[in-house]
Structure formats: C-alpha cells, structure tokens
Swiss-Prot record:
GO terms for molecular function: ATP binding; ATPase activator activity; Hsp70 protein binding; protein-folding chaperone binding; unfolded protein binding; zinc ion binding. Zn(2+) 2 binds at C149, C152, C176, C179. SUPFAM superfamilies: Chaperone J-domain, DnaJ/Hsp40 cysteine-rich domain, HSP40/DnaJ peptide-binding domain. GO terms for cellular component: endoplasmic reticulum; membrane; mitochondrion; nucleus; perinuclear region of cytoplasm. Its main location: membrane. The modification Phosphotyrosine is found at Y380. The modification N6-acetyllysine is found at K66. CXXCXGXG motif repeats lie at residues 133-140, 149-156, 176-183, 192-199. Residues 351-396 are annotated as: Disordered. Residues 6-68 form the J domain. This is DnaJ homolog subfamily A member 1. It is found in: Membrane; Cytoplasm; Microsome; Mitochondrion. InterPro entries: DnaJ, DnaJ_C, DnaJ_domain, DnaJ_domain_CS, DNJA1/2-like, HSP40/DnaJ_pept-bd, HSP_DnaJ_Cys-rich_dom, HSP_DnaJ_Cys-rich_dom_sf. The lineage of its organism: Eukaryota, Metazoa, Chordata, Craniata, Vertebrata. It comes from Pongo abelii (Sumatran orangutan).
Length: 396
C-alpha cells in the first residue's frame, strides 16, 4: 500500500506499474507537453519529469511509496530534482554537452499498428524545422552590419554586483537586454528581411520513415543531422519514436504474440479446428484432436508464428494462446440425457453423509453483498448511539 499516489496520477499509471509502463507513459506525456510544442505547459512538463525521475529509480520509488513526496524532498534518496530538460535528453538521447556543440534535436512520435511492426512499413512524415537563412547565410543582416554588443561584450550575459550588507556583495548574472543574449547587435535597417535578424527560418521537411520488421513500441529511428540548425553549431537530429496502437486480437510480449481463444465445452472434450487470421493476412488452422482435453485456462503455443525478430526477420517468436472454455447454460440437457452423459464421463466420487455434516446450498456470488452488509451494520451502530425520531404522519 503506497502512502500517496500523486506521482502515479501525474503519469496516469497504477501504483503497481512496471518500468516499461512508466517509460511508455513518460514518453507520451513528455512529447505532448514539451515546451517546444506547448510553451504554456512548462509547469506540467516539470511535474511529469519529477514524477518519472522518482518512479524510474528503484530506491526513490520505494522511499516515495513509504513516505510520499515529503520523504523525497527531505533528501532521503539523494534529495532534489534534476532539470526536466536533462531528463528528457537522457531519455531520448543527447545531453547538455551535446547541446552546446550541436543544434537541438527534434523528437516526433509516430503512431503505428502491430501490422506495421510485423510486416514492415514506410511512412512519409511532414514536419517543420529551423534552417539557417540562405538569404543572409546565417549572419542576420548585411555583411559588416553585425557588430559585437558593447553592453555585454559579445557574451550575451550581463553581470551586476549587488551589495547585500557591509562588506558583502552578491554577483547576479542575467541575459543581456540589449542583444537578447545573442552577443551581437544589428541595426533594424540592416536586418535581413527574410529572417528578421534571427539567422534562421522555418522550413517544411518531408521524411521517409522506414519501419523494419520486428521493431518495437517506443523504438527510436534517428535521422542524423536532420534536426534544427543554428549558426556555428552542427545540426541536431530528428528522432522518430514509434508508438504502437493496441490490437483487437493480439498483444505483443517481446518476440511473442499472445491471444485468448474461446472454445465450447464440446470442443474442449472432443477436439476442434479454429482458423486464425495472422498479421500478414495468412490463415492458420489450430487443431486439437479428439481425446486431447483442453482445460479452461490452459496455455499452449505455436512455434514460429510470433513477431519477426528485429534484423533477423526470417526468425519469429511464438504465438501463445490462452483457452477460455465456455460451459453451457443450466438445463441444457434433459434428465435422461444428463444420466447418459454421466455414464460417458469419468466416475464422480460419492460422499458418505454422516449426522455431523450439514447440508448447504450454493448461490451465485454477488461481490456487492458484503459491501451492503457492512454499510447496513454501520447504520445500525449509528442508530444505537444517535437515536432518531420516528416518522410522524401529518394530521389535519
């Protein structure tokens, strides 16, 4: 039992969520609320990052489950939180040092079906990215018109000294307001008309995304050097993250495919043949021969009918089938046929009744029955401590 569920609620998962479920939840939410896509959702993005930072760490998660957010803030497992952007970069690839040398990576989520991952597919993805302005060649203005900002001397930062007491000063660093942190200044009349002095422009890019057989939900496809461009930096990457939709029949478990199959009692006892449509539009027939009893909950498999193995597409996992046996309704047989059926089935064990035994009857289980009894019991106890007046009839 966890003390509080706030972090789990932020990610939209249950307290018993696996690491894979946590990763999938973070991936979807982080891409949705990233400041580049939702500039007004900075606080939400921060909450998502903090929740994932704690729950993805086994020690921090254990501490949180026992003591809640207060236990984390008190520093029992390292204390404090990392930068939301650092967590995002570590998850999707990249990092601070990389960002200093290269332009920003662009991350896009691509929705795919289980059929796409089974058969392979090609998708065209249209997106917007920053490219260096070709009109001014990334200068922001005419040749010779760009000058070093005299206010910050080209650093893009201002340092102010603030005296906070006798003999005590505080050094405060802030973005230079004169050049907006660029370290350069361009006269408005000399600014490039195409990019308005920003050195970059937005451009539409069409990417052809090849989804190989056997790729997995959450797998990344990286287009190196196709990300945002910035003057003086190497272009970043475009990272495509595959997001698999749920399938109506099959569930993927690693290289295996899992499904449930309903069969009737006669099929469970006497054998059956069941067709299954595969993800590559073939039909395979599952056969159980007479005399091979299939019990409710039995799990069997078909070799080499699961998912193709990534980069080894001619090898496949297993198709795993869990059987659900449907029993007939009450009274489906007349008494004489029921006697005949009993003779055909294995003999049942008779119970020798004694005087010490009590006869009881089976009834259908009602999960709400105990709840109602508990509620009524509390009501009776309440009446004992707080007697209520009887209902009076109105008299004329």
């Amino acid at each position: 039992m966890v003390k509080e569920t706030t972090y789990y609620d932020v990610l939209g998962v249950k307290p018993n969520a696996t690491q894979e479920e946590l990763k999938k939840a973070y991936r979807k939410l982080a891409l949705k609320y990233h400041p580049d896509k939702n500039p007004n959702e900075g606080e939400k993005f921060k909450q998502i990052s903090q929740a994932y930072e704690v729950l993805s760490d086994a020690k921090k998660r254990e501490l949180y489950d026992k003591g809640g957010e207060q236990a984390i803030k008190e520093g029992g497992a390292g204390g404090g939180f990392g930068s939301p952007m650092d967590i995002f970069d570590m998850f999707f690839g990249g990092g601070r040092m990389q960002r200093e040398r290269r332009g920003k990576n662009v991350v896009h989520q691509l929705s795919v079906t289980l059929e796409d991952l089974y058969n392979g597919a090609t998708r065209k993805l249209a997106l917007q990215k920053n490219v260096i302005c070709d009109k001014c060649e990334g200068r922001g203005g005419k040749k010779g018109a760009v000058e070093c900002c005299p206010n910050c001397r080209g650093t893009g930062m201002q340092i102010r000294i603030h005296q906070i007491g006798p003999g005590m000063v505080q050094q405060i660093q802030s973005v230079c307001m004169e050049c907006q942190g660029h370290g350069e200044r361009i006269s408005p009349k000399d600014r490039c008309k195409s990019c308005n002095g920003r050195k970059i422009v937005r451009e539409k890019k069409i990417l052809e995304v090849h989804i190989d057989k056997g790729m997995k939900d959450g797998q990344k496809i990286t287009f190196h050097g196709e990300g945002d461009q910035e003057p003086g930096l190497e272009p970043g990457d475009i990272i495509i993250v595959l997001d698999q939709k749920d399938h109506a029949v099959f569930t993927r478990r690693g290289e295996d495919l899992f499904m449930c199959m309903d069969i009737q009692l006669v099929e469970a006892l006497c054998g059956f043949q069941k067709p299954i449509s595969t993800l590559d539009n073939r039909t395979i027939v599952i056969t159980s021969h007479p005399g091979q009893i299939v019990k409710h909950g039995d799990i069997k498999c078909v070799l080499n009918e699961g998912m193709p193995i990534y980069r080894r597409p001619y090898e496949k996992g297993r198709l795993i089938i869990e059987f659900k046996v449907n029993f007939p309704e009450n009274g489906f047989l007349s008494p004489d046929k029921l006697s005949l059926l009993e003779k055909l089935l294995p003999e049942r064990k008779e119970v020798e009744e004694t005087d010490e035994m009590d006869q009881v009857e089976l009834v259908d289980f009602d999960p709400n029955q105990e709840r109602r009894r508990h509620y009524n019991g509390e009501a009776y106890e309440d009446d004992e401590h707080h007697p209520r007046g009887g209902v009076q009839c109105q008299t004329s």
